[in-house]
Amino acid sequence: METWRFIDSGDRDPAYNMALDEALLNWHSEGLIPPTIRFYGWNPPTLSIGYFQKVQKEINMEMVEKHQLGFVRRPTGGRGVLHDKELTYSVIVTEEHPDMPASVTEAYRIISQGILEGFRDLGLDAYFAVPKTEEEKNALKNPRSAVCFDAPSWYELVVEGRKVAGSAQTRQKGVILQHGSIVLDIDEDKLFDLFNYPSERVRERMQRNFKNKAVPINELRDVPLSMEEVKKAFKDGFEKGLSIKLEPYTLTDAEEAEVKQIAKERYETDEWNFRK
C-alpha cells in the first residue's frame, strides 16, 4: 500500500492557507515530497474567491469588512466560498500517478472518493451528483451565481439531493491540486451578505433556493459533530477511498519560511486579490 503524507496545519490565516497549498504543489512537482493530503481551518473566517472572479462586479467588500472576514483569491477556479465552520482539505498528487486519470472530471471523482468514504463513515448516505440532462450540463458551464454552494457541479457530493462538499481543482507543473470544503454549520445570512445582486428580490430568491440545494453536515444529524470527529472520519475516508496509508508530517522551519514568503509575495497583496 502506498504511503502519502498527511498534514494537519490547524486554523491559519487566508494568505498562509493558499501559500501552503501552492508550496506543496511546487515541492511535489520537484520530487521533494510524496503525494500529500492536508487538513486546515481559517482564522479569521474568510471569503475565498475563484481565480477568475471579478471582485468589483461580484463581491460586496463592505460586508466582508463589516463581518470582519479575511479575503483571498484562490489559485483554483470556482466561485465564492465562506470558510467558517468547516474542515478544508487539499490533495496534492502528480498527474503521472498511475491512479490519476487524465481527464479533470475523472481525477476529481477518484480524489473525491476519499470524501465520499468520509461521509459514509459519519453515517451519511452521500453520492456523486452527475448531471444527466443537457440543461444540467449547461447550468455547469454558465453558473448563475457567484456563490459556490449554489449548485452541484460534476461529481460534487450530495446527501438527500443537497450539496454537502464543494471542491475546486487546478493543474500546474504536472501536479493536481484539489481543495475543498466540508461544511459543519453555515450562517446563510452572512454568506449572502457577501455578494452583489441586481436587486434585493434576486437575493431573497437565491437565498430561499439555497436551502434546497446545499446543506451543512450538522443539519443532517441529530447530534452535532465535533471538528475532531470530522477530521478522523475524513482521514480514514481518504485512506480507504484512495487505498493509501497517511503518515503525519510537520513542516520544517525552512519549509515554513518558504510558505510565508509565498504568502507575502502573492496572497497578501492587493495585486493578486483584487486583480482585474
Curated annotation (Swiss-Prot):
- For whether the record's keyword set contains Transferase, the answer is yes
Q: What else is known?
A: In the reaction, the free carboxyl group of octanoic acid is attached via an amide linkage to the epsilon-amino group of a specific lysine residue of lipoyl domains of lipoate-dependent enzymes. The reaction proceeds via an octanoyl-thioester enzyme intermediate.
Q: Which PROSITE patterns match?
A: BPL_LPL_CATALYTIC
Note the site residues: Lowers pKa of active site Cys: K163
| A Pfam entry, by short name | LplA-B_cat
Q: Recorded E.C. number(s)?
A: 2.3.1.181
Query: Record's superkingdom?
Result: Bacteria
Q: Does the keyword Metal-binding apply?
A: no
UniProt xrefs under SUPFAM superfamilies: Class II aaRS and biotin synthetases
Q: Which organism is it from?
A: Halalkalibacterium halodurans (strain ATCC BAA-125 / DSM 18197 / FERM 7344 / JCM 9153 / C-125)
What reaction(s) does this enzyme catalyze?
octanoyl-[ACP] + L-lysyl-[protein] = N(6)-octanoyl-L-lysyl-[protein] + holo-[ACP] + H(+)
Record's keyword terms, sorted: Acyltransferase, Transferase
Q: Which HAMAP family match?
A: LipM (MF_02118)
Cystine bridges = none
The subunit structure is: Monomer.
What this chain does, per the entry, is described as: Catalyzes the transfer of endogenously produced octanoic acid from octanoyl-acyl-carrier-protein onto the lipoyl domain of GcvH, an intermediate carrier during protein lipoylation.
Tell me the Gene Ontology biological-process terms attached to this UniProt entry. Answer: lipoate biosynthetic process; protein modification process
Provide the active-site residues from the annotation. C148 (acyl-thioester intermediate)
Protein name, please? Octanoyltransferase LipM
* Protein family: Belongs to the octanoyltransferase LipM family.
Q: Which residues form the BPL/LPL catalytic domain?
A: 31-246
- Which EC class is the enzyme in? transferase
* A molecular-function term among this protein's GO annotations: lipoyl(octanoyl) transferase activity
The pathway is: Protein modification; protein lipoylation via endogenous pathway; protein N(6)-(lipoyl)lysine from octanoyl-[acyl-carrier-protein]
